[in-house]
Amino acid sequence: MPTAAPADMDTFDPSAPVPTSVSNPAADVLLAPKGPRSPLRPQDDSDCYYSESDNETPSEFLRRVGRRQAARRRRRRCLMGVAISAAALVICSLSALIGGIIARHV
């Protein structure tokens, strides 16, 4: 497998594209474009900007950002509620199972 020559820091160009090759599938996986957004993955704020050239007032922008943050908090609280409920269900089920095993042997 060919290896890349070490880069000399005097000639290193940080803006140069990162090469990928078929011989290194791990790099291809790491550099592959991300798929559709998962509801569990936090959303990025790539479209969260304010420009006076847009047809949006500062108060509308702040309201939009506030609604987005409130929705994130609401989703996070719902996810935590589901996780806590699932954990409680698992603990109760294990407790019942262990109780049944102990009762059978007594």
From Swiss-Prot:
It comes from the Viruses. Disulfide bonds: none annotated. A motif (Di-leucine internalization motif) lies at residues 29-30. Residues 44-56 are annotated as: Acidic. It is a single-pass type II membrane protein. GO terms for biological process: intracellular transport of virus. Residues 103-106 are virion surface. Residues 1-81 are intravirion. Signal peptide: none annotated. Phosphorylated on serines within the acidic cluster. Phosphorylation determines whether endocytosed viral US9 traffics to the trans-Golgi network or recycles to the cell membrane. Not N-glycosylated. The chain crosses the membrane at residues 82-102. It is found in: Virion membrane; Host Golgi apparatus membrane; Host smooth endoplasmic reticulum membrane; Host cell membrane. This is Envelope protein US9 homolog. Belongs to the alphaherpesvirinae envelope protein US9 family. The modification Phosphoserine is found at S51, S53. The keyword DNA-binding does not apply. Essential for the anterograde spread of the infection throughout the host nervous system. Together with the gE/gI heterodimer, US9 is involved in the sorting and transport of viral structural components toward axon tips. GO terms for cellular component: host cell; host cell Golgi membrane; host cell plasma membrane; host cell smooth endoplasmic reticulum membrane; membrane; viral envelope; virion membrane. Residues 1-61 are annotated as: Disordered. Keywords: Host cell membrane, Host endoplasmic reticulum, Host Golgi apparatus, Host membrane, Membrane, Phosphoprotein, Signal-anchor, Transmembrane, Transmembrane helix, Viral envelope protein, Virion.
